[in-house]
Amino acid sequence: DEVSFIKFENDKFYQTIKKPYSLLIFGSGAHVSSLISMANLMAWETTVIDINIKESFVNQADTLIELENLEDILTMDLSTYNASVILSHSPKTDDIYLKALLNSNMNYIGMMGNKKNMQRIKQEFGLQNDKRFFAPIGLDIGGNTHQAIALSICSQIEARKNGRI
């Protein structure tokens, strides 16, 4: 959320601008496009990270980061991001992305996947009580289109951001 505070005092003009909320998206398939659009409507800053970025699906993102090697993510500084979603649909890739994110101070880490695989992830990474980890990702709003999934993900992130969940 971009918030601006303006005041005029002693013949001086002061303006404080709060940094926009930042969303880090892992994966660049067709389903990511709707998430970027929805995040843009929320005035969030979006960054997409992937091994082979599919630019036609992510051209509305603010920043694109293409990794040369998957393991490069483990050495990146992710501390400037508020939230992240893992949408790569590859268990090996998802596990490495999650490992990198768990070393960050992010308030929201969401992962797409089926309930069985998400139980495995929670068990394997010891995430049963981690309040910032959401998997399967998104609120259950009953939709299954890319747009409805994007809405459910952004709604969950917004609820977490505002202390509702």
Predicted regions and their residues:
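Conserved N-terminal Rossmann-fold NAD(P) cofactor-binding segment
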Residues: 54-72
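Short amphipathic alpha-helix with an adjacent loop that forms part of the alpha/beta core around
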Residues: 70-80
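Segments forming oxygen-rich coordination pockets for charged ligands
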Residues: 1-50, 58-63, 82, 96, ...
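ADP-ribose/adenylate-binding Rossmann-like module
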Residues: 83, 88, 99-124
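Residues in the short beta-alpha loop(s) of Rossmann-like NAD(P)-binding domains
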Residues: 51-52, 115
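Short beta->alpha connector loops
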Residues: 28-31, 90-92, 115
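A general structural motif
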Residues: 20, 80-81, 106, 130
